[in-house]
Amino acid sequence: MIRILSSEWLKTKRTAVRWITFFMPVVTALCIVAYISGRAGVTADFVYEGFFTVWTAVIIPLGAGLLAGFIIHEEELAGGFHGFLNSEVSRDSVYLGKFFLLIFCLMSCTFISTVILCAGMNLAAPGNGYYAVFMTAALFAVIGSLPILAIHLWISLLWGIGASIGTGMGGLLMGALIGATSLGDKIWILVPWAWPVKLSMFPAVYLLSRTDPAFGDTVRQMMTGLAAVVTGTAVFLTGGMIWFRKWEGRA
């Protein structure tokens, strides 16, 4: 699988995929650091909530749509999927290779941005942060995004880059309204685009006392969210792989 992932990464050379993976998170983090530097009395809680809300509700839905769309679009341009579908590698391995490439890109994006943000916070407001909590939240954001990546990979193959980007824009609205506001308090568990938003907030439980009434409730919600992510990833990834075994390209 490492060899397949390496091969998939080589295909992204001179494409927008690498720009999205490495350039976009740097710009995003630097903009936030500049904002922090220009304000007095900024707290770690404020930065934590603001950054991860924007990242999970806006950047991840749009980024997943763009990354999946571009990765599959490159295969479409390279002979209309013929080389892609007629590879000596099994269909399941090809599909998983694309999925793991998406995970690698999203993970790189998220951790690059978070590390730069933490470094910037340390310069702008020394000692004003819980950096382990930030990194844990970044990990939870990536984990919560796995079902979304599986959905976008399937959509990109089935309908193309336009559908993937369009779905990402719809996911942005769902993530912002259902994941980031009280409107979705009772239904967020049913909406995959709300999962990274909610999961990225749960590591803040570290800042609560274990005797706080909210502590136990937060932990229970976190476990429910993780169970939903595991189930969603299994369903969408397995469904996509079964469908891909018989797929012969778009007409």
Language-model segments: which ranges?
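Terminal transmembrane helical anchor/hairpin motif
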Residues: F46, G171-K246, A251
